[in-house]
Each structure stands twice: as structure tokens, then as C-alpha cells.
Amino acid sequence: GGAAACLLQNAGFDVDVYEQAPEFSRIGAGIHVGPNIMKVFREMGLEQQLEAMGCDPDALISRDGSNAEVMAEASVRDYGATYITVHRGDMHLLQVQSLDPQKLHYGKQLLNVEQTPDDVTLYFTDGTTATADIVVGADGINSKIREILLGVEPPLYSGWVAHRALIRGEKLEKLRAEHPLDDCVKWWHKDRHLMAYYTTRERDEYYYVTGVPPEEMDTGGRSFLESVHQAMYDAFAEFHPRIQAMIAASEDITIWPLNNRNPLPVWSDGRLVLLGDACHPMKPHMAQGAGMAIEDAAMLTRCLQLEGLENYSSAFRLYELNRKDRATRVQSVSNANSFLKAQEDPSWVYGYDVYAAPIRHTEEDNV
């Protein structure tokens, strides 16, 4: 949502952002910004600032979880932009600070929308309303806009959970003194994995996220639950001692069910359009979920610039036509959890430039 707002604002559109949270906070943890996404931050005018925040690994490394042997290594240096890993909250703050503060509206939980031939009205739970020409639903896997378009459909549990934790301060220093830590690494063993990387330029914060297939869990409607170190030890008992040391050094550990949704028959309806997880949620196993949302935002902006706001319907059609194949491919590979498990060429992911891609007008147009 922040990317879409920034890009549309920079393109001259009058943009208001409605956020249900009462204020901005540094939530979340690590996120990858590949070269394909950094090119969009370049367009936003935020590339250098973002680069200064994150760690820039030379390569992505895959290791055998039992013995630490390298299974694959992919350089990320030759794709026309930097690859960084950074704290999600720091990246979001950079985007938010680029927006007109008078156009940011917090504490706005959407209740409903009403379309007319001339505009669309948003109704919020606090009793206020807002009117716009179009509404971009960048509201995640539990998207209210998606629900309005297609009806209530609970997310589908994928059969996987993710443990997440940060390592900082003296615990990180002690860990690093005893074990070599890769800048960005994914550990694989049997049916589970653990990805670890730094989230700051100073390398003073190390983050890991796992993928584990347990039985279905009941979160009581919450996005995540607190976990305990013993659960991590149990889940990764067969992993290398370096992983055991990382678990011991972890601060609070949380556990998140990974949910999916069925593919959408349409990405827009009337004056409403979806992007990102609201449209094509995926498991985080390629670290490209947010990336696909940001590419969506860039293509949607291009199509609205090309067609004009008055021709929003045509712009939405072009946007879906030019994004669906790539988003679906990334979604499929990510959900299969096979990316870089063995040596392969990742240029189809990182070498992509959403601004260099010609806009297709029909299915038959060659890319």
C-alpha cells in the first residue's frame, strides 16, 4: 500500500491512504528487497535511503541443515540494483515518510464500500466516510476489499507454520564469536527449513524465519501466537549445532500459521482493484511476497498513467493482464518451496524490471 501510494502520488494522482492501525509502529521483522524491487524504490526516489538501512549480501546461500554443507549459492550482484535484507518496519517508515502527511488517515477500519457510476464511497467503523474515483485494496490476505468483491471466504491453512525470532546485543555477539553467520542463508533438512539474515546495515540484528509442517493449529483468530524455545528445539532437533545455538540466543519466538487463498477469478470490479496479498497471497519461501505487491503497484501506476484515471476500467484490465502470469509463477514456485534448493539461475526473478517490460494489450502480445 505504501508503495502504491508513493508511486501514484509521484505520478501526479491525488492519493489518500486509509490505515486501520491507530498509528505507525515498527511491526514485523525481516524482509528481502531484491534487485527487481529495488528498481521500484529507485522510481520512488528512495533507493539510496533504503540501501543505507539494510544489509547487502553478496549471495544467497543454501545449506544442508544437518551438516552445513553448501547446496547452492546464487550471486545477487549483477542485476542492475542492490539486493538487501532489512527490517520490515524500517522499510515501511521510509515509504510512509515519503507521503503527504495530510493524506494519511490512521484508525480507519473499513466497514463497506458503495459504488456509483461516478465514484465510490468508503464507510469506516468510526462512522466517517470518504469518496474517491477508485479504491486500491492493498489490505493483505484478510482483505476487506476482496471480501466485498467476492464474498466472505476464510483463508485456507497451508499446512505450514513459521517461527520468527530476532537475535540482538550481547547474545548476537556471543553467537557470532562461536559460530560463523552467513549474511543470508537458508538451511534445508527433510520437510522443513530455516532462513536467517541480518536486518540492518550495521549487522547488529539477526533474524530467522522457519517453515515447518505441523498439524493444523488453532490461533483463536489471532495472526500469531507466542512460542517457546523448547518447541523450536523439538522442531529442529536434527539440525546443525549452529541452528541450536541460534535458538538459544533468540529473544521472543512467535509462531504464525501460513495461510493461502484460492486464485481470484478477477482482480478488479468497477472502481475497486486489488494488489499484493489481497490478490495473490503466497507462502514466504521465496521472500518475494512483498516484492510481488510492490511490482503490482508499479504496473498499476504505469497502466493508470497510460490510460488515464477516467479510463480506470481499461487500466485495471491492462494491469491484471500484465501482472497475472508473473505473480502466478512466483506464487507457484514459492508455494512449492523449491527455489534455490539446488543450484539454479534466479535471473527470471531478480533480473526482471517492471519498468522495462513492455505493456501488453492482449494475451497474444509477446513479452
Where would I find each of the regions flagged by the language model?
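Flavin-dependent oxidoreductases
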Residues: 165-198
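Conserved mid-domain beta->alpha element of the FAD-binding
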Residues: 1-22, 136-137, 196, 230-232, ...
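Long, positively charged, glycine-interspersed low-complexity recognition regions
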Residues: 50, 130-131, 304-367
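Accessory recognition modules or surfaces
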Residues: 20, 25-36
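Conserved N-terminal helical subregion
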Residues: 9-11, 34-170, 215-233, 365-367
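FAD/FMN-dependent oxidoreductases across multiple families
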Residues: 178, 190-192, 198-206, 212-286
